[in-house]
Amino acid sequence: MSLNSATFAIAQLNPVIGDLVGNCDRILDAVNKLATQGVHLVVTPELSICGYPPRDLLMNQQFVRDMDIAIVNLAQKLPPKIAVIVGTASANPLANQTGGKPLFNSAALLQDGEVKHIFHKRLLPTYDVFDEDRYFAVGTGSQVFTLHLQDGENLRVGVTICEDIWNDEKFWEKRNYADDPVAELTQNHQLDLLVNLSASPYAVGKQKLREAMLRHSAIVHNLPLIYANQVGANDDLIFDGRSMAFNRQGEIIARGKSFAEDLLIVRFDKGGAVPATSDHESNDAEIFAALVLGVRDYVQKCRFRQVVIGLSGGIDSALVAAIAAEAIGKDNVLGVLMPSPYSSEHSITDALALAHNLGIKTHTIPIQPMMSAFDQSLATLFADRSSDVTEENLQSRIRGSLLMAISNKFGHLLISTGNKSEVSVGYCTLYGDMNGGLAAIADVPKTRVFSICEWLNRTNSPLEIKQGSTEVIPVNIITKPPSAELKPDQLDQDSLPPYDILDDILDQLIHQHRSATEIIASGHEQAVVERVVRLVKIAEFKRRQAAPGLKITDRAFGSGWRMPIASKVTS
């Protein structure tokens, strides 16, 4: 038996952070299913025992000891003969003597009831959402094992973990590390197969980069490659799965599902590449699928059953309601209308039409009585001052309080509806519309919100919310000018540049890291750019207090955004 007649598998799993028993059960169930198909080696994602990222759970010494126990127990339960590689954290035995971090980010080879080998991650990402140097020591020791096949033949397998494969000097113009673990492996060992355990978060456009990089690695090193990626959402991070296997020519011969668990059988004797067709018709479709997974997993893993959303009749709350209904079912979504004297009639009818299209429940609470109560309570103190944004924000805070009351009373998760454009410049109210336990579209620019809603109406994708209806988002919600409706005849463009201009400036500032001078040079008006840059800086205190936002771009206002609040920067 040789590589071409051996059978491999990828268990693309959705772990729950910290659920060692549940995660081991998922692995065991997957391996038991694969055992019936003659599999010799199963590869799972990075840190599959505890889920990625475990963050400061790794500082809990008992949690780490429990991981060791869980791996031993799992090894004893696995079917005999099948080799399984799982991701785990393991102790650094030299930490006390020589210093350094107490743990390694590791991969454990389990077979015949035992933990046969432990391999350690060499490259520890500490940028954007990654903070592995906080917990882990740089890996040392062998990254190779011999897979003994039933006919007496052996295969030499090299084991890498996520970032280890992201530093090829022949692929990247600029590298983050001096070392290339894959190059060192292939130079020092005669390998038959390379595997990579990964927990690579989703971002728009990232899959093309992954495929190109992994294809390059397979071709350059003349090695078949198995890449096992985590799927599921953990807090702000969404993992898209899309595990792959490449032959030594760089052709993809197995491809995992996106945004769903999957078990892939990998046979290197089965000919050429699998079709390269995408399972999503556009970026809008892909982002929607990512957000649906993000909401579903956040709700379920936080042990909620239902959600509540404020329905304004605007496009942001419409999209969030659609995402929620698709994620957890229409019967588990409550939309609350809270009209004020400034709410237009079409906003109310649009919100109700949306709810009808989605099939979600609604409840209406006019806020005029509460507005009057606040006005009376503050009348003496505010007597010599004219109305301004204070009164506008009070309306938002009344609505936020009502939604939180409903959340508390019924145990529903409140999902806030602010988009990235608004969150960037602070066009949102702290303790008002920012209230919530999850910000579903906080990384989605306003222009993208429009395009996703337009896609929802025209797509033929088999979505639950499309059953029996061609129109998901009422057309008037998409076509009417955006407005917060906090004062008479108010439009967003009274306070902000047009969204196509604003989003381009924000893209250059946040994603391309350009200065105001460079953005102005690209063709935008100086006054507009300088105002937007200032708004982004002074809104930092709001973002610091916002609900966790699902990340779908390469630069989000979440765990990877670390800007000071009290600062003075002129550049």
Which functions belong to the PLM regions below?
Residues 1-310, 323-330, 337, 362:
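Enzyme catalytic cores with a strong preference for nitrogen-chemistry domains
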Residues 18, 153-155, 222-223, 248, ...:
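ATP/NTP-dependent adenylation/nucleotidyl-transfer catalytic domains that generate, transfer
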